[in-house]
Structure formats: C-alpha cells, structure tokens
C-alpha cells in the first residue's frame, strides 16, 4: 500500500505558497460503452489524511467503498455530477467530461483557491494545475477518483438490476469479450 504522504507533494507545495482550499477533480466513465461519465470535485482537509487513499483503479472495490464513506464524511466540500449518454452523445465524450468536471467544481459549497485536475484544461474561474496521471500522484485527485468511481459503480449496479441482459453487474458498462 502506498503511504498517503507520498501523494501530498503537490498539495504541500501549494500550501507553502499560501493556498488553503485545494480542490481535486477527477472523472470515471470515459472509456465504457454504456453508462454515464461521473465527475467529483473535492476539497479535503490536509491536516487529517486518510490512509489508503490512492488512484481508484489501484484500490479494491471493498476498500474503495470504505474510503468513500470516510472521504465524504471528512471532506470540507464534495460534489459529484454525472452526464448521461444523451449528453455525452450531444457534446462528445471529451467536451462532456470537461463540462461535467466544471459543473462538479462550480457546485462545491466552498470556493477552491486552486483546482488540481488530471491533465485536462478546464474553463473555470479558478486557477488550475494540470497533473498528468494526477489520480496516482495527488491526494486530492485520488480522493475525487474514489468518490467518482464508487458513485458510478453504484449507478451501474442499479442498471444491472433493471437491465440484467447487459451484464452491467460484471462489466460496469465497459466492453468485454462477452
């Protein structure tokens, strides 16, 4: 398991520069054939770190669910937005992802001083820092990735019950050999 302090490099540098409310934003659902793109923006307290936080793809499902509850409870502010297939088809997946991220950020109950984003450029009224592979390098982005992943997975589990013939319980909307 990665020590959560290893994910604090960017946040610590920004704190030293005087930034207080550091927002991480991430998305899930850009690659699947079905289901929404889901984006979460989160501002975490940086003096009370949650051990186990990491890129959602590197955390087991059970651990993600536990971390989700802790992140949502401890967050200074958190907001999740999902865009459905109609919105994605209307805009294209890249533009839908950017708009979804923007809406997640703009819906926060606390204004961020700076937004850390996983490599995309966003049109928002806040200073941004793009970090390639940010969900694996930034505590704030990793926290957002966990909340977004659990939220989307829960939605896809509901869809699996409603439409069992599509196998969403096993594939979460991603293409498989099945």
Question: Model regions: which residues?
Answer:
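RNase H-like, Mg2+-dependent phosphodiesterase core
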Residues: 1-178
């Amino acid at each position: 398991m990665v020590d959560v302090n290893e994910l604090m490099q960017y946040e610590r540098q920004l704190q030293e520069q005087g930034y207080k409310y550091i927002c991480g934003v991430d998305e899930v659902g850009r690659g699947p054939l079905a289901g929404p793109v889901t984006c979460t923006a989160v501002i975490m307290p940086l003096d009370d770190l949650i051990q186990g936080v990491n890129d959602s793809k590197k955390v087991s499902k059970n651990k993600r669910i536990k971390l989700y509850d802790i992140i949502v409870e401890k967050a200074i502010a958190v907001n999740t937005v999902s865009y459905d297939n109609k919105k994605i088809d209307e805009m294209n997946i890249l533009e839908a992802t950017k708009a979804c991220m923007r809406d997640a950020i703009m819906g926060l109950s606390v204004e961020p001083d700076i937004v850390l984003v996983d490599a995309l450029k966003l049109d928002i009224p806040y200073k941004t820092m793009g970090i390639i592979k940010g969900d694996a390098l930034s505590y704030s982005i990793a926290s957002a990735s966990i909340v977004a992943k659990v939220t989307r997975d829960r939605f896809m589990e509901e869809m699996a019950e409603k439409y069992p013939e599509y196998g969403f319980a096993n594939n979460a909307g991603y293409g498989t050999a099945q």
